[in-house]
């Protein structure tokens, strides 16, 4: 028969100490996720790879209001199409618009910024972002879908769809980059 010279209180303290050390080690190991990704670490979806865009160009920071749900829908759409997104919620979103010189009539609910400084305002479908990044027009700064048209990525409402224009942002007047008449024109 096994007998111990230790009291139950001593065993409890030792068990507690060992459990604490083990828990701390486990938490430390789980917390180390490594460096933040700079591009998708997995291969791009074939439909995205066909655009010939360098995966490093698919890293964006999205500036949006913390309470905006439709922006989350657009972020999910972008991530499904190979983009790596970091989201920021500035207290003064209007300062982001001013810093990037986005005219009031070209604004929407969020602004996405690449590391190269290209801006994508609002619910711009990934298809047009990829097309732009593959061959940016001379003098262009980015694209905008002003306002929040129903049926754009993140603004889906059943089968409803409002035609809209994707605007090319330049140092001069914006001009039409794409005229989207049907929801199917948004697909990558």
List PLM regions with ranges.
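Thiol/selenol-based redox catalytic cores and closely related redox-interacting motifs
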Residues: 99, 105-187
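N-terminal secretory signal peptides
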Residues: 1-26
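Short active-site oxyanion
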Residues: 59-60, 83-84, 116-119
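Solvent-exposed, polar/charged alpha-helical surfaces in well-ordered, non-transmembrane soluble domains
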Residues: 61, 72, 76, 80, ...
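Thiol-based oxidoreductase modules, predominantly thioredoxin-like and allied folds used
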Residues: 85-96, 106
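Local sequence-structure signature of Cys/Sec-based thiol-disulfide redox active-site neighborhoods
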Residues: 53-73
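Bacterial signal peptide processing site
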Residues: 31-33
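Low-complexity, Pro/Thr/Ser/Glu-rich flexible segments characteristic
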Residues: 36-52
């Amino acid at each position: 028969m096994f007998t111990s010279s230790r009291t139950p209180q001593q065993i409890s303290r030792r068990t507690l100490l060992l459990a604490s050390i083990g828990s701390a080690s486990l938490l430390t190991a789980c917390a180390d996720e490594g460096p933040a990704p700079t591009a998708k670490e997995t291969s791009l979806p074939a439909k995205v790879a066909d655009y010939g865009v360098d995966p490093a160009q698919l890293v964006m920071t999205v500036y949006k209001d913390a309470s905006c749900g439709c922006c989350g829908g657009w972020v999910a759409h972008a991530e499904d199409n190979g983009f790596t997104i970091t989201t920021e919620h500035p207290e003064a979103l209007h300062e982001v618009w001013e810093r990037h010189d986005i005219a009031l009539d070209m604004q929407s609910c969020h602004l996405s910024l690449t590391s190269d400084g290209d801006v994508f305002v609002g619910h711009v479908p990934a298809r047009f972002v990829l097309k732009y990044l593959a061959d940016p027009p001379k003098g262009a700064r980015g694209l905008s879908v002003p306002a929040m048209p129903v049926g754009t990525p993140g603004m889906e409402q059943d089968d409803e769809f409002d035609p809209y224009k994707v605007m090319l942002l330049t140092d001069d007047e914006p001009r039409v980059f794409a005229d989207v008449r049907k929801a199917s024109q948004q697909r990558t």
